[in-house]
Structures are given as C-alpha cells and as structure tokens.
Amino acid sequence: MDLHELERLRAENEQLKAELASKQHQIKQNDIKSYKGLSFEEHRRYGRQMIVSEFGSLTSQLKLKQCKTLVVGAGGLGCPSLMYLVGAGVGTIGIVDDDLVDETNLHRQVLHSTTSVGRLKCESAKSYLQELNPNVNIITYPVRLSNKNAFEIFADFDLVLDCTDSPASRYLINDVAVYFNIPVVSGSGLRTEGQLSVFNYENGPCYRCFYPDPPAANSVTSCSEGGVLGPVIGLLGTAMAVEAIKVITGFYHNTFKPFLTMYSAYPQQTFRVFKMRGKQKTCLCNHITRQAIESIDYSEFCGTLGPVNLLSHDQRISVHDYNSVRNSDHVLLDVRPKEQFEVSSFPGAVNIPWDSVLSKTTNIDKIDQLQLPPKSPIYVVCRYGNDSQLATKKLLDMGWNNVKDIKGGVSRWYSEVDQNIPFY
C-alpha cells in the first residue's frame, strides 16, 4: 500500500467518523431539553454571540438556524466563511466546488489539511465542519457551477456567498441570484489587498450595476500568478461571514446602503468603505430571465486569455531541446519577478524582470546597459512561457539575433524535465 492510498483511507476514515458523530449528535438532540426553539446545548454553544446587543439575541440565532446559505467556492475565501458560518449556527450550508485540494492551497485554505490533498474540497470541508458543529446540515455539490445546473442548486437557498476567483463565475452567480431574488455577499483578494460588497439586497444594486462590463481578460491576475498572503484572504473571508450574519439576522433591514469595502494589509492595515451607486435602471437585473441566463456564454462574455503566440517556430525552443544545450555556452535570461526568481531559479541564470525592467526599456542603449552579451545565444524563460515571449520579441526587435524563448517556461521544465527544483 503506497503513501497516497494510506492518506486516502485515513481521510475516508476521518469523514466516516465525522458523519457518525453527527448522526449520534442528532439522535441525542431528539432527547435533549429545548427552550424557545433551541436545545440547551445550542443555548450554551451560541450564548456568547446571543448576548451581543448588535447581534439580536435569541431571535437572531433562530434566524441563523432557519437560514439556508450557499457558499460557492471552498478555497481561500470560502474556508474562513464556512468555518464562522457553521460555528455561528447557520442551519443549512451548501458548498459548491469541484476542485481538488492541492499542496499550494494549504497556506491559506485552512479547512483543508495535508491529509486532504487530492480530495474534493467540498468533501474535505464537510468533514471538518461536521466536527466543528454537528447541528448544521451540510450539503455538498462537487460540480463546476454553470448556467445549466445553477438554477437547481440556487433554488433551495436564502443567501449566497460568492467566494470564487473568476469574472465568469461572478457574473453567473449574480444573474442566477437576481433571478431568484437572493442576496449575494461577494469578496475577492489578491496579493495583500481585497474587497467585499453585498449585492441584490433590499432592492439595492447587483454586481452588474457596479460592473456592467467585465475586465479585459489580460488584466485579470489569478492567485497562482500574482500570489496571495494567507491571512489577507482569510480576513476577507471572515469579513464576508460577518456581512452574511448581518444580512441573515436583518441588521440592515430598511437601512441598507450600497457599499464597497476595500482592505489593504501593507504598509499599515487599512479598511476603507466607499458609498456606491444604487440599482441602475439600464441594468440587465431589471428584466433578467432564465432563458436569457441559459443563453449567455459566460466565458465568452468575460473573454478568455488563450496562449500567447507572438513568435515563429524557429524563435522558440522546447524544454527538452533546451536541456540538450544547457551545458553549452549561452545566457539564460529569467524574466520572472525577482520574488519568484528568489524562490526557485536555474543555476547561472540572469534575472532581468519583464514587468519592472525589460517592458519599460525603450531603446537599445538601455538594453546595452543590462549587459547581455550580444554574441552568445540567449534563451529566455519565465514561469509559463508568456512574458518570455514578450521579452524575446523585444530583444529581437532591438537587434539581438540569437535569442530564443523556452516554451512553457519553468512550469513545463518542472513537469517534463526536472522535478529536482523547488516549484510553487
């Protein structure tokens, strides 16, 4: 039996133990004394939040217990949101996520553990959450949300948390939520910053009212490309849970005003709250239909950034071909940001970042100042093979003839040639 099989069996055993504990707890609950709709155990469990005046006492706790909340995405935002909503006693929680737990998730997606790697995120989350609070009914949807399955999923819920990281998902979640008149708590985060809002609530604006047009595909940076500080995304997910509790308990009733909260972790932590415009008369949300939603190609609407192909075949080299010339006389130019270069780099590589240096260099004199030997072959590498093409083209356009791009970058080198280097 290999290590992966052992970890799978261990994770399966933990899930079965959690499900058994939940069933046993439910059986006990049938025989436990209750008072005004909550068992004595629930009174003790939630007592410290029920005595907070802003929360709303027993009435608000019962609203949480009766609420059905759907969380789309069990990643960096979804994990803390789920932990605190389940801990707070939301009665039913749905989790939509078809992704698998990966080692690169663990620094920020704190519902998952090392033994969860390879498991469905929604099932890994369920195992943890059932142990956290067996009073909560947790439903998992291990599917990729689409305009074909979203209607059946959303129909049973009172509130949605958008914990996704792509514009296409955000517009889809918004449109289906508007169709069912379900409020949406939406958040996002990248690097050291993030934001959150509440949409489609108290006759307020929807996501489209704020953002009628999607961002350009080449302007959207993912966590894998731009990075993210774990506590930053955790703080934003926790703040989303706070907003969800306020919506569920009616804190904003008749007083809600559209807002956008911006968070920045560096240099000093700051929260800024901006008043936003209300519902727009020209927005699609005023006349949305199921037929219209099902007819939209959300990926096409938001644009997809396909592979960059700026160079001819003879201006590029595969990772295998580069491996065969690696010991010959040449210059390896690594154009990744210096932070990535420091994490993992090839011995002898020269780091001249594309974003901060090469892309801003406008004449050949400045290129000369970079001290690249013009007669030696130059091979250009980046993380995935996109920025390296831009850098190669620029060098070729400015007079360097013996320059080639390494296709697929460090990522492909790691997957196809050599795994004895750190990868991130």
UniProtKB/Swiss-Prot annotation:
Zn(2+) binds at C206, C209, C283. Keywords: ATP-binding, Cytoplasm, Metal-binding, Multifunctional enzyme, Nucleotide-binding, Nucleotidyltransferase, Transferase, tRNA processing, Ubl conjugation pathway, Zinc. InterPro entries: MOCS3/Uba4, Rhodanese-like_dom, Rhodanese-like_dom_sf, ThiF/MoeB/HesA, ThiF_NAD_FAD-bd, Ubiquitin-activating_enz. ATP binds at G76, D97, T104, N105, L106, H107, R108, K121, D165, S166. Binds 1 zinc ion per subunit. Residues 326-422 form the Rhodanese domain. The keyword Membrane does not apply. It is found in: Cytoplasm, Cytosol. Signal peptide: none annotated. Its cofactor is Zn(2+). One of its GO terms (molecular function) is metal ion binding. GO terms for biological process: protein urmylation; tRNA wobble position uridine thiolation. It comes from the Eukaryota. The active site is at C223, C382. SMART domains: RHOD (SM00450). In the N-terminal section; belongs to the HesA/MoeB/ThiF family. UBA4 subfamily. This is Adenylyltransferase and sulfurtransferase UBA4. The lineage of its organism: Eukaryota, Fungi, Dikarya, Ascomycota, Saccharomycotina.
